[in-house]
Amino acid sequence: MKCKKCDQKAVINLQHHNISFCKEHFLEWMRVQTERVIQKFHMFTKEERLLVAVSGGKDSLSLWDILWQLGYQADGLYLDLGINDFNNYSSDSAEFTRRFAEERGLQLTSMDIKAQYGESIPEMAARTKRGHTKPCSQCGLVKRYLLNKLALDGRYDAIVTAHNLDDEAAFLFANVTHWSLDYLGRQYPLLPATTGFARKAKPFCQIYERESAAYAILSGINYIYTECPYSDGSKQLRNKRYLNMMEDEQPGFKTQFYLGYLRALKAGAFPQQQESAAKLEEKRCAKCGQPTQSDGLCTFCRLVNK
Ligand code: Q46
Ligand code: ZN
Ligand code: ZN
């Protein structure tokens, strides 16, 4: 197997594109693909300031590295969730992220949630009805809220997350199987800024998980291999397995599934998007001033105030 570009021995074969690359040309291909997606969806420019959500894992560190190599002004934000019960997931991922930023001279903001709000994510979740077994919904809520708040406070032009094609396709699969029209109206790789919400972009939305892992390994990025202990047995992982079976049978399936959805969304298949955004802007949290659907406090303030 030879590299498509230089005839050297290939180190990776991209079945869905039917091409193979050597290390150097694969790393270059990843940067070109990412830049293409940024341009295609008019995500952001080199003059704008970006806040990248980093977890210490392969996707976020690969994306941060690529944005840096492409010349974007990308700072990192690491949220320490305080998940250290079964393994040292949070402490270790904080260390991988810190070292990555230090080696490249990149600006990293870290927030320790327990130090800031008095409780770790599992402790906060344990006080809620459903969160005592799995803290994922509270974790998602806190991460979304703080990422947005810190981006607005820091006057960043956009939030960048490393959701890859496997993540997006699995989320889409869940939304389609439940016909969650509200979510289906919002799963665009670029969400423009609205009152109280920063712009959000997903430049890896067309990059397979396998490709971002290969990028991290081949470019020598040290990332955390262990997953969060709470991700075990999640619906998202189960849906990824189903989609992997489809992809094995039919290389390129995930790309077709996701790009087909984006075409339908653009054609106006899910008009709920505007309606729910308008509803949200009517009310404000009494404590933090963020738009909220409920009266009084927003869901974040209710969770941390208990
Ligand atoms: S970090 Fe948080 Fe995930 Fe862990 S507790 Fe669940 S949501 S699984 S991306
Ligand atoms: Zn080559
Ligand atoms: Zn609030």
Regions inferred by a protein language model and the residue ranges of each:
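ATP-dependent adenylation/nucleotidyltransferase module used to activate substrates
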Residues: 2-185, 194-197, 209-219, 285, ...
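Flexible helical/loop "lid" subdomain adjacent to adenine-nucleotide binding pockets
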Residues: 39, 166-170, 174-204, 209-212, ...
